[in-house]
């Protein structure tokens, strides 16, 4: 099975994650469609799922000292009496393409939290397996680690039996970055550079302000850049096709918009305006302003004058297009319905789905109306199996039809019926969901 790094390698297409032992999350398995929705009542744990995914990916990329600090973060350690101090577990199922062959990748690790001053956190287990997609072949083990030993597969024809020395808070996947000769070096590189973006800015106003001061590291077109007009200018200059696509889909949602214009204004930043080298900011020699031309107005207006919903929709569409450019594996959007009229939301979600390439989107909501515009197969419902512990379940295929039928019988929308069940502790979820939540 040759997977030597060659030209034409693609990013990591995340298919599923499993999270356990993070705040109030217990064995949460999320299988990703293009768009995946976490639906639950307020204060249930939807945001914890997003935070746990972010934490899991950041832990892979973190330095050894940073990992030790992360493993001692008391704000994240489970404190529910039913799962106090439970180990953190993070597993991913991924698709990646190498040399025109698609591979299934399974990677996961587990560590022990530092629950008190006397405990030393350590990585309990780690595993990496791969197999060609749709071939029926068995997985090939590349990393096999437990609390006593760490092993890796050195050659394509050998077994996963070569010992490797790692620190208690170091991942084998980190150590193998220096092993350029191993045949799966490209997968190791990709694992260590997976990207996740969290969009939880419910007020987008500040992102439209022209500002010559920018954070170092965000000078170029990045998905998490805070200066949106500058990002749009760079998109127009560096990737005009993507810029045209952004304008096209936005005008689909807002038909009165005729054009989106971005202008650059040069400024003279004098010597006295330069910041010290050790500050995390820099002063550029230009500011950028975004304008929108509306068919009902005599002249273009500053985009900052648009409604809150119009600004947030444009910002999110921009992030998604940038995600495809930058090989971001997953974007999380909290409350995408915020400030968006219900009549617009269905078209908005359809456009988001169509824009996605290898990137996936996960959204959270506690709004009944959003559910009515989502495919039931996209939805993971948050249900308490034990008090205070969050679990999420998908619908059975028969449960999807039953939910729609029962909602119609009660003359309710699917979303209203679903949330009425969530609010009722006596609801019988077993008929609807993939597993028995009361077993």
Model-found features: residue ranges?
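Conserved ABC ATPase signature
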Residues: 248-254, 259-321, 330-343
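N-terminal pre-Walker A segment at the start of P-loop NTPase domains
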Residues: 2-26
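C-terminal lobe/lid and adjacent interdomain/linker elements of RecA-like ASCE P-loop ATPase modules
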Residues: 7-11, 346-439
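Phosphate-binding P-loop
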Residues: 27-33, 323-326
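Electropositive, glycine-dotted interaction segments
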Residues: 103-258
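Conserved P-loop NTP-binding catalytic core
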Residues: 2, 7-10, 50-121
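Phosphate-binding glycine-rich loops of NTP-binding sites
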Residues: 32-75, 126-128, 313-314, 319, ...
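C-terminal structural cap/anchor segments
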Residues: 310-312, 316-376
């Amino acid at each position: 099975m040759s997977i030597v790094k060659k030209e034409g390698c693609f990013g990591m297409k995340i298919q599923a994650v499993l999270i356990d032992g993070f705040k109030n999350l217990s064995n949460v398995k999320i299988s990703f469609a293009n768009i995946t929705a976490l639906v639950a009542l307020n204060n249930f744990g939807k945001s914890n799922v997003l935070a746990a995914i972010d934490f899991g990916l950041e832990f892979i990329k973190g330095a050894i000292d940073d990992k030790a600090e992360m493993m001692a973060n008391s704000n994240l350690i489970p404190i529910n009496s039913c799962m106090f101090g439970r180990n953190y577990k993070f597993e991913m199922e991924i698709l990646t393409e190498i040399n025109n062959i698609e591979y299934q990748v399974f990677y996961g690790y587990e560590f022990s939290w530092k629950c008190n001053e006397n405990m030393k956190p350590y990585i309990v287990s780690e595993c990496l397996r791969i197999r060609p997609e749709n071939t029926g072949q068995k997985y090939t083990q590349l990393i096999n680690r437990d609390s006593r030993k760490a092993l890796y597969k050195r050659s394509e024809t050998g077994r996963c039996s070569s010992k490797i020395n790692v620190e208690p808070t170091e991942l084998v996947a980190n150590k193998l970055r220096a092993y350029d000769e191993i045949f799966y070096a490209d997968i190791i590189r990709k694992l260590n550079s997976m990207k996740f973006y969290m969009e939880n800015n419910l007020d987008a106003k500040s992102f439209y302000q022209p500002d010559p001061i920018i954070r170092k590291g965000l000078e170029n077109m990045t998905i998490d850049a805070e200066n949106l007009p500058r990002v749009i200018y760079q998109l127009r200059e560096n990737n005009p096709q993507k810029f045209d696509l952004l304008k096209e889909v936005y005008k689909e949602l807002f038909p009165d918009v005729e054009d989106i214009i971005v202008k650059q204004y040069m400024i003279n930043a004098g010597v006295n305006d330069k910041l010290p080298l050790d500050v995390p900011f820099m002063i550029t020699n230009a500011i950028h302003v975004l304008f929108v031309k509306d068919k009902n107005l005599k002249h273009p207006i500053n985009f900052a004058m648009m409604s809150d919903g119009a600004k947030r929709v444009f910002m999110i569409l921009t992030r998604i297009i940038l995600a495809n450019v930058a090989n971001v594996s997953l974007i999380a959007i909290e409350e995408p319905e915020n400030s968006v009229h219900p009549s617009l939301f269905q078209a908005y979600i359809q456009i988001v789905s169509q824009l996605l390439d290898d990137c996936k989107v996960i959204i959270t909501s506690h709004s009944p109306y959003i559910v009515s515009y989502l495919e039931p197969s996209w939805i993971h419902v948050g249900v308490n199996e034990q008090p205070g512990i969050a679990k999420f379940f998908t619908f059975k295929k028969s449960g999807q039809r039953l939910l729609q039928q029962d909602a119609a019988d009660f003359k309710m929308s699917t979303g209203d019926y679903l949330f009425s069940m969530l609010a009722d502790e006596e609801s019988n979820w077993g008929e609807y969901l993939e597993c028995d939540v009361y077993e």
